[in-house]
Every structure is written in structure tokens, then in C-alpha cells.
Design a protein with these regions (language model features):
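C-terminal helical cap(s) of enzyme catalytic domains, especially alpha/beta-barrels
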Residues: 264-275
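Active-site acidic/histidine proton-transfer and metal-coordination neighborhood
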Residues: 22-28, 34, 61-70, 74, ...
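A short, acidic, flexible beta-alpha connecting loop/helix-capping segment that sits on the rim
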Residues: 255-265
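Glycine-rich, proline-tolerant flexible connector loops at the mouths of alpha/beta enzymes
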Residues: 36-63, 116-120
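Acidic/histidine-rich catalytic cores of soluble enzymes
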Residues: 2-10, 14, 18, 22-24, ...
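A structural motif
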Residues: 32, 106, 201, 249-251
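Short glycine-enriched, charge-decorated loop/helix-capping segments at active-site entrances
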Residues: 49-55, 123-124, 223-229
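Active-site-proximal loop/turn and secondary-structure-junction residues that shape catalytic pockets
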Residues: 12-14, 39-43, 81-84, 113-117, ...
Length: 275
């Protein structure tokens, strides 16, 4: 079986009002070895002003690589979520993210189906998602980049729904990025779902959910941006680790998705102790 490592999604710094470079440097100081940057298409005010962690793909991709290299961090994936069912929004976005990932050595690009258009049927959405995924897979296959499909929205909120998206396109470039917190909040059994997708896993979002958050939203939502510190919530991380160890042949990074630097530090300590 493959090796499990712990990484951090740069969303941990969203509450700090700091730029990407700060998120990278602080992650390294906490002891992380892997990082998952988030990229966006075009320009937006907050990140341009240095108050937010995302990086424009209009920038030189080596802005990402150089910052991570200088901090001694390895990029586990790029987060490039967008609505796969809306090709005019996510088509060029995800293809550029894949090309960016290939240039800087990121092995995975994570995404999901996103919020659907209000006027389309499910059957129409499947055609649109298939189109976007097929186009993206053609770019990814040539560059040895994996596309990590995540459970996050209306169709991927169940094991059957995520598999339906996965099976739309037959490509070695397409895998699964299971988000433990999203799976839990959607009302699913995280562990049986993980067992189901473990052989196809290319990345994992290590998101824990507090009891308070669970009581408020479980079964009512399909996901959440960030969770609490790993070990503070409802997820049994020893069980998650054992499932991946026993069923996933490739190396996997558990990319922590939490809301603050303090939560990120405690998440790393908790997961490392279990590993």
C-alpha cells in the first residue's frame, strides 16, 4: 500500500487576511511538508491587495513553485473548484489549472460539479459535466496530472452520485478526492464511502466537523468550506487512516481543511500522532 502524508490547504489562512506567500511560510513553520494552493481565473481585489491566499493563474506559475520550494514544501495538489456542469465558467479554468499544475509539478487538480444552472435538467447536466471532464482529461492525460473529483454539491453528495460523475468519462487521469467533512455533513457514512473509493483515491481532504456544526447542518447541506481542527470533531481519524492504508495502492496526502492557523497546527499534531 501507499504512504500517507499530512498536508495543509491554504484555506487555513483565509481568516488571517494574508497573501499566499504568508500562508506557505507559516505552514512550513508549523511543520507541514505538503501544501495545497488554491488558484483562481482572472483577477480579484483581495488577493491582488495581499489580503487573501488564492493565486491568479494569470500570474507566472513559478510564483507558486518558488514560494513552496523556498519554504521546503511539496505541492500535493492545486485546488481549482468550479461548476463542471457550466463549461463556459469552468472549461478553460480547469484546463489552465491542469497546465499550471504540470508546469510546477503538482500531481493533482481538485474540482467538483459545483452549483448547477437553474434551468437545466439532471440529464442535461450530465452531458455538460461529461463535456467539461472529457476536455479536461485530454489535457491531463498528456501531462500526467490527475483530476480529483470531490464530493461537494448536488450530485456528488452521495456515493452513487459521485460514482456517476466519475464514470462519465473513461480516463486514467480521473480519480477521487474524498472530503471527509463534506461526506459527513451530507448525511453519509464516511467510512463505507471511503472504502468504496479508496482504490481510486488520488488525494484526500482531511476535514473534521465539530459536534455543534454537525447538530446544526448534518443532512441539510452538501459541504462546507472548512472544518474544525482534526481531532476536535466527529471524524474517527484512526479509522480513516486504516482504511486508506489497507485499500489505497498509491501515496496519498491528507490535506487538512480548517479555518485558522491554530487549528492547522493542532490538526498536524493529531494526525502525525496517529500515523
Amino acid at each position: 500500500m501507499g504512504k500517507i502524508s499530512v498536508g495543509i490547504n491554504t484555506e487555513y489562512s483565509r481568516s488571517s487576511d494574508k497573501p499566499f506567500e504568508w500562508a506557505v511560510e507559516h505552514a512550513a513553520k508549523m511543520g507541514y511538508k505538503y501544501i495545497e494552493p488554491m488558484v483562481h481565473f482572472g483577477r480579484e481585489l483581495m488577493s491582488e491587495a495581499g489580503y487573501f491566499h488564492t493565486v491568479s493563474m494569470f500570474d507566472d506559475p513559478f510564483r507558486i513553485k518558488d514560494a513552496c520550494d523556498n519554504a521546503g514544501l511539496t505541492i500535493s495538489a492545486l485546488q481549482a473548484h468550479g461548476p463542471l456542469g457550466r463549461p463556459e465558467v469552468h472549461g478553460e479554468y480547469i484546463k489552465l489549472a491542469i497546465r499550471t499544475a504540470a508546469e510546477i509539478g503538482a500531481p493533482v487538480v481538485n474540482t467538483d460539479e459545483g452549483l448547477k444552472a437553474k434551468w437545466t435538467t439532471e440529464a442535461e447536466d450530465m452531458v455538460l459535466i461529461k463535456y467539461t471532464l472529457k476536455e479536461a482529461s485530454l489535457v491531463a492525460e498528456k501531462r500526467n496530472v490527475k483530476i480529483g473529483l470531490e464530493c461537494h454539491a448536488q450530485y456528488s453528495k452521495t456515493p452513487e452520485g459521485l460514482d456517476k460523475l466519475y464514470n462519465l468519462v473513461d480516463s486514467p487521469a480521473i480519480g477521487i478526492n474524498l472530503d471527509t467533512g463534506n461526506a459527513y455533513l451530507a448525511g453519509q457514512d464516511v467510512y463505507t464511502w471511503l472504502e468504496r473509493v479508496a482504490p481510486r483515491l488520488v488525494h484526500l481532504h482531511a476535514k473534521d466537523i465539530s459536534v455543534e456544526h454537525s447538530d446544526k447542518e448534518r443532512g441539510k447541506v452538501t459541504g462546507t468550506p472548512v472544518g474544525c481542527a482534526c481531532g476536535d470533531g466527529v471524524i474517527d481519524w484512526k479509522r480513516v487512516i486504516d482504511i486508506v492504508k489497507d485499500n489505497t495502492p498509491q501515496d496519498i496526502v491528507f490535506s487538512v481543511e480548517c479555518g485558522t492557523p491554530e487549528q492547522a497546527k493542532r490538526s498536524l499534531e493529531h494526525l502525525n500522532n496517529l500515523l
